[in-house]
């Protein structure tokens, strides 16, 4: 489900939906694992936002941002994506640009300011060690904090590309606990 801002007329809303579906289709063609990961993140994010009691319109925006959170990976060379998580410093620098690239793809679409802000900040961490802007605490949009948790959770519970193995349950739990502690205030 793609959230269409209510301020748009029917023609703009249809165009906006088509643009989002186009980006999702391109992501699916480029890397099906990332596309499926985005679907999982969207479902978990929407569920979390709803359980937090956020308004339905905000839940819908968070779900759309979660669906599109990795569209910036369309700009990352396949050879780098295939090596995840084992990247050189240079490759990490290229990979980390996907947040800004994804936000840039949507920020000029009417009504998508919040969604592009969430996409830009989905790798920020509560303690300020995230990227791309090293935002800290309450400066990270709530939607980005919500999207960040299932992003890490699904990444630790599914096989790593090229490895074909999941993390062990103990290691996976340890990773989630550590990551959650720097994503949300304790």
Q: Where are the predicted features?
A:
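Histidine- and acidic-residue-rich, metal-dependent catalytic cores
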Residues: 1-186
């Amino acid at each position: 489900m793609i959230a269409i801002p209510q301020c748009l007329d029917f023609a703009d809303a249809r165009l906006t939906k088509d643009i989002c579906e186009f980006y999702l289709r391109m992501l699916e063609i480029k890397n099906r694992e990332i596309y499926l990961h985005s679907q999982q993140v969207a479902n978990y994010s929407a569920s979390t936002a709803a359980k937090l009691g956020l308004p339905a319109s905000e839940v819908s925006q968070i779900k759309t941002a979660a669906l599109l959170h990795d569209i910036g990976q369309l700009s990352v060379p396949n050879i780098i994506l295939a090596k995840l998580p084992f990247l050189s410093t240079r490759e990490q620098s290229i990979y980390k640009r996907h947040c800004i690239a994804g936000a840039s793809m949507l920020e000029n679409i009417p009504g998508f300011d919040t969604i592009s802000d969430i996409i830009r900040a989905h790798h920020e961490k509560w303690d300020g060690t995230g990227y791309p802007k090293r935002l800290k605490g309450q400066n990270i949009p709530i939607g980005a904090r919500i999207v960040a948790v299932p992003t890490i959770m699904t990444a630790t519970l599914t096989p790593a590309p090229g490895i074909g193995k999941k993390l062990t349950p103990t290691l996976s739990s340890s990773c989630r606990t550590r990551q959650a502690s720097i994503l949300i205030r304790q």
